[in-house]
């Protein structure tokens, strides 16, 4: 039926900040949906709290609200805008939960707002464990025996009847939060207790474990006329028991017989029809490898991570079509945008294999619990396309950017057999590499399949890769073996290693003998129909389908998988750069490996290459396309690191030149540049070994900040207070980058701020100065940033602007740069300069209304600031106050300490804007899920050096009616200054310690700082962990607590006797 005309205005809810389990795939889905609705002529109102997304750009919807996704604020916007309908299925779990809450509170009925897409009853049936179970029984679809419980005792009783192992799944949580596998009663008690707390409805499902079955997913679509189809099926390399977001996945499924595929396909279609879902839906099934038995695991009645993967794997734009279906269109009326000639009621066919590998944050969290289970831990993922499994798997391995270029981690060769097999059996994030090592040691696929329940088909492929390695080793320079290796996805670098030569020589040999890749098109129909998608992958074969156009082109390098320190912000800058390239009349080509993002949506650029971001893969595209040049400044450290090898190969780097990039990143050159420009920095030195470092620190004086050069997101950065700690740091952390020295700097405790600047080589535009709430020592990505600055004097701001101009001109910056400053006693020091777009670009672009990445790109392509209508210097300030606040994913990462420091830990960000600082802060805290009631108890556990400052905060908390609790030393200090605090016991002091108070719900906030010995703070770690697990606001920086107090004070009344 045609689209609906009885609705005009539609509100779309976004998914909020990026957390583990809910990443950039929702920016992609939301952006697609908004465009899709506007295309049909509807007025679109968007609400999302995440400024780092394309989705929250002004042009995406008719009205964009960057406000907290909470009942209070969404209700306000609904009342103000009065939309006819609400579309919540594109905002992940956040959007769905918000819709449920609005409905339960009667808001939707009161305002007459209709829900589009999927009815609430269907969301309830899919998400509520009990209703789902009833529906499956009605449809006669098998599900594992299970019981809904609301208490720990009920869980223990049920497990006793079906036997262990069992799986615990809390209701209405995201990415398996709070769930897990339990092998015995002790584990069951622990996991269920935590799961019940995390479930908004205090409900868990206890089910029989079917670990070891094959995990298969079907991505299905249905419309209002009951047309339904399968977009794509996918098979997990890892069997059931590991969250699908943490599994390696292949599409299409590889090991099912036709009968099994039809059986599971029918089950998926009957489920989506029974739920009456209109739009996209994801069905997860478990298949017994030894019989035709299967179970339905779960159904996601919304666009999900898997649908982003399915869209990119097939080219079929699920979110775009889900939005069309939501407004009444049917699949047989909508043209498939990929072919431009077939209708969307056409199941995609693939003539290639897609591999997805998750990207984990354990390079940042050395202490994190790496064992995988039913709770998701990956921050992002990579996808690669090839003509066989070996090719797509090896391309995906080198896309991960974890320092490997093959399915091999060289260090594993030294691991003992026993340790190796333990890691093969107990899956961690790097299990693929352990399994590959076991095969290299002669374990057979049969033996490994027995241990891991990974299908023997995949293990045979790993064996095949190993056989090619041996062939290569035995026949150096042999062209036939070289061809075979390239057909199976081997990199030049791996081949060079096996031949004992260099990658350059292998590349030379390939080019001389015309062994070069061809590019194939992703067209949804296995080339059955003509197609017009400019979406390509490389393979070694016959016919090349990517034809170079006559137009001059520019290649933009994306930022690869999302990880801590390099998030969706860089994708944002990439997409904006492409817009500007097109506006300047060039053809824009994107190269990227991340299936979740907007940049890898083929409709964004003129050509998309879905390829690993390595020198070899980029050069292959350059050889074919012969672009005018390559832009590296928007792809984070990933792209910057490719600048030097590309320039050496004669490629034109557009924007800041490699020599100048080096002057900003190389310590000695940078110091020299600052001296020449007469700009102060904290005194520092470089050291290449332990003795040099100790010597440097003695000369500068403790405390010092130590870090390796050339890293992103403060990896392996630490503040050390004495020589013993420094020596232990040099022993454990220096391997962070072996051929680059370690920097030892004087650590200045002061006010930190940062600036993004855009330069055309003569003039410099400074959109704004962002002031950090946390003092220096907390990574800029983990600090709350305020724009415009609230406490900086006019003189300091002028100095910052002056230093910024000098640096941009002195370092020959063309395009963007980011500078971080620290201010102490009105004196400004430069801490670091990044000659590229930084993670604050989207936030600053939105609050100043300057499309910074577009402006920078236009300058890179030859325009000047004055031509674009911008003045030299600091841009006029906004009258509203805007705050960027970090969001963390600690609930998902056991054993990771939530203490903030110089190493970045946040996964996402939110923004709060209002007329005053206090109101903006309130919104930022609410949006980042830090909700403090107006009364309650706050507990202080404070290091000696901060007790004075904490006393002042405690008095203010007491003034607004909070009860004060404190650990022994802190309580004694408070008492000696006339403030009575209720003492709490030491850790392990059964009922009287902080964790037990937290469990009983007697504490509303914890303020915990750590002194000089950051290492020996096990009690503090337990306190912080208990806060995270029970959702109690935790402040590890007094500045953040002070900001929260400002909010509470502005919202409370002080009662005093006269």
Curated annotation (Swiss-Prot):
Annotated S-S bridges: none
Keyword Ligase attached: yes
Positions that bind Mn(2+) 4: 832, 834
Binding residue positions for Mg(2+) 2: 298, 300
Keywords, ordered alphabetically: Amino-acid biosynthesis, Arginine biosynthesis, ATP-binding, Ligase, Magnesium, Manganese, Metal-binding, Nucleotide-binding, Pyrimidine biosynthesis, Repeat
Region feature Oligomerization domain, mapped onto this chain: 402-546
Recorded catalytic activity of this chain's protein: hydrogencarbonate + L-glutamine + 2 ATP + H2O = carbamoyl phosphate + L-glutamate + 2 ADP + phosphate + 2 H(+)
Residues in ATP-grasp domain copies: 133-327, 671-861
Pathway annotation from the record: Amino-acid biosynthesis; L-arginine biosynthesis; carbamoyl phosphate from bicarbonate: step 1/1; Pyrimidine metabolism; UMP biosynthesis via de novo pathway; (S)-dihydroorotate from bicarbonate: step 1/3
Region (Carboxyphosphate synthetic domain): 1-401
Binding site for ATP 1: 129, 169, 175-176, 208, 210, 215, 241-243, 284, 298
Domain MGS-like span(s) in chain numbering: 930-1058
Organism superkingdom: Bacteria
Amino-acid positions noted as binding Mn(2+) 2 in the UniProt annotation, renumbered to this chain: 298, 300
Cofactor: record remark: Binds 4 Mg(2+) or Mn(2+) ions per subunit.
Region Allosteric domain, residue ranges: 930-1058
List of residues binding Mn(2+) 3: 820, 832
Residues engaged in binding ATP 2: 707, 746, 748, 752, 777-780, 820, 832
A biological process term (GO) from this entry: L-arginine biosynthetic process
Family per similarity comment: Belongs to the CarB family.
Recorded domain comment: The large subunit is composed of 2 ATP-grasp domains that are involved in binding the 2 ATP molecules needed for carbamoyl phosphate synthesis. The N-terminal ATP-grasp domain (referred to as the carboxyphosphate synthetic component) catalyzes the ATP-dependent phosphorylation of hydrogencarbonate to carboxyphosphate and the subsequent nucleophilic attack by ammonia to form a carbamate intermediate.
Assembly mode: Composed of two chains; the small (or glutamine) chain promotes the hydrolysis of glutamine to ammonia, which is used by the large (or ammonia) chain to synthesize carbamoyl phosphate. Tetramer of heterodimers (alpha,beta)4.
NCBIfam families: CPSaseII_lrg, PRK05294.1, PRK12815.1
Protein name (Swiss-Prot/TrEMBL): Carbamoyl phosphate synthase large chain
